[in-house]
Amino acid sequence: MKRTVLLIVMCCLAFGGHVFAALGESDDQIAELFGKPIDQGVPDKKGITTNVYEKGNYIILVQFLKGYSMAESYTRVDKQEFSDKEISAFLEGSSNERPWNKQPDKQAWERSDHKATAWLQTLSGRPTLLIQAQ
């Protein structure tokens, strides 16, 4: 199963397909990538809407402010750890063509323009990659 998911991720990257969300994309662009949310959120007091999507072996949460994504989280349905290649693919998808710099001795990254951070954290027993605009 891991090999199949990795193969799909690598093929999509190799053929230049846009398969991962990028911070700042509209809710329509996110829906084109992930389909209809399995849980459509409603705006909170700050106007932030959190939608939940499921695509392939991943559960994806995307937070929107004024219709544009400001944070994303990715977790595997099977609760397995992410491979380095999966992490790289998700970060690349949210790079906006800027490199990510890994923090020493941590599973955390900062985008070179200092406008986004990412980190790995276990939430509800699931390894989760979180990506957030600053």
Where are these regions (language model features)?
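Sec-dependent N-terminal signal peptides
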Residues: 4-15
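Sec/Tat signal peptide C-region and signal peptidase I cleavage site
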Residues: 15-21
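A glycine-biased structural micro-motif
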Residues: 24-25, 35
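A cross-family detector of function-defining hotspots
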Residues: 31-134
